[in-house]
Regions:
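Bacterial Sec-dependent N-terminal signal peptides
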Residues: 1-26
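Contiguous, structured surface segment used for ligand recognition
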Residues: 24-156, 486, 497-532, 536
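Feature activates predominantly on carbohydrate-active enzymes
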Residues: 26, 101-301, 305-310, 316-328, ...
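Flexible loop/turn segments at secondary-structure boundaries
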Residues: 167-169, 195-201, 277-283, 330, ...
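Aromatic, loop-rich ligand-recognition surfaces of beta-strand-rich domains
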Residues: 197, 583-650, 658-698
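Active-site neighborhood of glycoside hydrolase catalytic domains
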Residues: 283, 289-293, 297-394, 401-408
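Flexible, acidic glycine-rich loops studded with aromatic residues
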Residues: 381-386, 391-396, 402-547
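Predominantly extracellular/luminal regions of secreted and cell-surface proteins
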Residues: 546-582
């Protein structure tokens, strides 16, 4: 890990050596109010600060400023107005304890004159954020004279890192916490358990880490797709393991305590996620009696009909709560298969006893019970939006990832929500042309798209719903991210867009933000982070940047094979609206098909036309199970009844290719009114995505 001083040494040495107007300063997130004043303040060597903080609050602050900024502080009852650097806390201890959930208690005022810097806030958290702004203002030991008043928009400004699919060391986690603090992010969602490996020491259940914290292959995809995939015992327990391709690790309880304290010193709350009842392959491997079948490798769900499952989860959660003081405990709740529950005698008995109509209600029953346990222990349940299926537990908070509607629905019903919709907030998706970028997981989310996302739609601004939207979070799933450099490349700078969304009420627009990102990215690189350089961005797929002019534009389309409703794009007008898709399948221009018919559509040209060329593009994205068709057939007809095949193409693309856009092209001359395009799938469960049928391109 880069030592703690790296931020002081690198972040404080931002690129410019002369003072620029404040509007050009690279402050991220943009402050609420900033006024330029005459002059500059010099950070002289040996500068010391004074503060009225005392006790543990003073100790934490002084340790941080000494280590990171090389500025020690003294604690005094009434900081002198003559002191060159003053931090003044005006609030109470009770307010300090409430600050993490209150935007007003996180605010600060920063006043810089040629002779003094004063930061005033009601809480230590607010003072800390004032220091981060001060650090971003400093250039070449000079700070421009300014007056800033600043308060965040949302109390929850988060980042999630998946540590199950690939394990990240304590130092690597701390490094990201440092950057989070610098950009005023305050929630770290720690995804600790999943099928890729269990990462937290649980003293009552040692087999979780002894048997499933390591696996026999570092490449998650290769390992996961094996029919006989194997976990590996802790290599420290093996007589001979050198040379074996063992990947993994886990955090001891001492590791976790250290990281929790490290985060707290930066005013970051860590929210642990313990997946249940799905995504539990590793649990039922170590303790197969907790599955419906009693056998490992037969399911990924816990048996929610067995009492011992609840005993196990409650015992695990007791140890979790001893380590993490967070209000919320995240229980996952997403993507449970529920397959074995349908035939499991224990699950069926519970369904009968509690009059549950389906397995979705059975999962809801499980979630309600876990929530009662957490509530009885003074905590609250947070889960992915699948916990809304069945009936939502009464006090649960929802993390909305499958779009925005689930979150808005939960908020309307009075539940607190964290917005993390995958199309905007999943940082493991491609951020530029997928054919030139490192391997990523589905989708395409460029910086501008992430920046433009607003957790509260315009229609709901100023309504009572706003108070239930706690904030926004970026998420990094690491199935295809093995190395720290790759992890950081995916996180930065898109996380900076979410930092600004979470903090700044009146944003200045993407063009201004992009300029600030360039400076911030350079600073990140000097500090040892492998950030994506937005100056090298290729941008949107060229074909998507303008309307395609062709004779089929606006013509009616008959669907003999229906598109999937969740990938409907613009419905029946999609394939002749002149709009080609971007690099990603989620942005509303690509239409998805998965039924047995595949793509089978007829374009009515309105009259018999000389058809000279027909084009269509098909996406191939391996990890999203979107494949180029097995066959593409072009047919024509004058009457719409009798069709003649004029072309049949077998693309011959290897399904092992990560990403490509296959261009189907036909040229010739045929008179017809109806143009029919058919495309069959390579595999029964594979998707076909296409965006436009271009006829007689102009």
């Amino acid at each position: 890990m880069i030592k703690k001083v790296f931020i002081g040494a690198a972040f404080l040495l931002l690129s410019a050596s002369i003072i620029q107007p404040v509007s050009a300063q690279s402050i991220i997130p943009q402050p609420e109010s900033i006024t330029r004043q005459q002059g500059t303040f010099t950070l002289a060597k040996g500068l010391q600060g004074v503060t009225n903080l005392k006790g543990e609050d003073f100790k934490i602050l002084n340790q941080y400023t000494s280590d990171v900024m090389n500025i020690p502080f003294s604690s005094v009852k009434n900081p002198s107005a003559d002191a060159p650097l003053r931090l003044i806390c005006t609030g109470t201890e009770q307010e300090a304890a409430m600050a993490a959930d209150s935007v007003s208690l996180q605010g600060y005022e920063l006043n810089v004159t040629p002779t003094a810097v004063t930061i005033q806030a009601r809480t230590p958290m607010g003072l800390f954020y004032g220091l981060q702004t001060l650090r971003q203002l400093e250039k070449d030991h000079q700070i421009p004279c300014v007056k800033i008043t600043d308060t965040p928009r949302f109390a929850y400004r988060g980042l999630m890192i998946d540590c199950s699919r690939h394990f990240w060391s304590s130092d690597e986690i701390k490094k990201q916490l440092d950057a989070m603090a610098y950009f005023k992010l305050d929630r770290f969602h720690w995804h600790l358990t999943d099928g890729g490996g269990w990462r937290m020491e649980v003293k009552q259940y040692p087999r979780l880490t002894e048997e499933t914290a390591y696996r026999t292959e570092s490449d998650w995809t290769k390992w996961w797709n094996r029919k006989n995939r194997q976990y590996s015992p802790d290599p420290r327990r093996l007589v001979c393991w050198k040379g074996m391709n063992i990947h993994g690790g886990y955090y001891t309880q001492d590791d976790i305590k250290e990281i929790v304290d490290y985060a707290a010193a930066r005013h970051i709350t860590i929210i642990p996620e313990i997946e249940m009842p799905g995504h539990s392959d590793e649990v039922v491997y170590a303790y197969p009696e907790l599955s419906c079948t009693g056998q490992p490798y037969t399911q990924s769900d816990l048996c929610v009909g067995k009492e011992q499952t609840y005993t196990f989860m409650e015992n695990v959660l007791k140890e979790v709560m001893q380590l993490f003081p967070s209000k919320y405990i995240h229980i996952g709740g997403d993507e449970a298969e529920r397959r074995t529950w349908k035939t499991c005698p224990d699950c069926q008995r519970v369904m009968k006893d509690y009059h549950l109509k389906d397995v979705a209600e059975l999962q809801s029953h499980f979630t309600h019970r876990i929530e009662r346990f957490l509530n009885d222990n003074g905590r609250k349940l947070l889960g992915w939006d699948e916990i809304m299926e069945g009936t939502l537990a009464p006090n649960a908070a929802v993390m909305s990832w499958r779009g925005t509607e689930a979150g808005l629905t939960a908020a309307k019903s009075g539940h607190h929500v964290v917005m993390a919709p995958q199309e905007f907030c999943y940082l493991n998706m491609y951020q530029d042309d997928p054919m030139t970028e490192p391997k990523a997981q589905g989708g395409y989310t460029r910086l501008e798209k992430t920046y433009n996302y607003d957790p509260i739609p315009a229609a709901y601004k100023g309504t009572s719903l706003e108070k239930y939207i706690d904030g926004v979070q970026g998420c990094v799933w690491t199935e295809f991210i093995e190395k720290p450099d790759h992890l950081e490349y995916m996180i930065y700078p898109r996380l900076l867009a979410l930092a600004e969304t979470g903090w700044t009420k009146q944003r200045t627009g993407y063009a201004d933000f992009r300029q600030r990102v360039i400076t911030a990215t350079d600073a990140l690189k000097r500090a040892g982070y492998n950030a994506f350089d937005i100056r090298k961005e290729k941008g949107a797929r060229p074909e998507s940047r303008s309307i395609v002019q062709h004779e089929g534009l606006g013509k009616s389309v008959t669907y003999l094979g229906r598109y999937a409703e969740k990938y409907r794009a613009e419905g029946d007008s999609t394939l002749t609206n002149g709009l080609c898709g971007d690099w990603g399948y989620l942005e509303g221009r690509w239409q998805g098909f998965i039924d047995s018919t595949g793509v089978d559509v007829i374009v009515d040209m309105g009259k018999v036309t000389d058809i000279k060329d027909v084009e269509a593009n098909f996406m191939h994205q391996l990890e999203a199970v979107i494949y180029v068709p097995n066959t593409i057939t072009l047919l024509v007809s004058k009457d719409g009844k009798k069709f003649t095949t004029i072309d049949k193409t077998l693309p011959g693309i290897k399904t092992s290719s990560d990403y490509l856009v296959y261009p189907y092209r036909w040229k010739g001359s045929v008179h017809a009114r109806y143009v029919r395009l058919k495309a069959t799938s390579r595999e029964p469960d594979a998707w076909i995505f296409t965006d436009e049928i271009i006829i007689n391109k102009k």
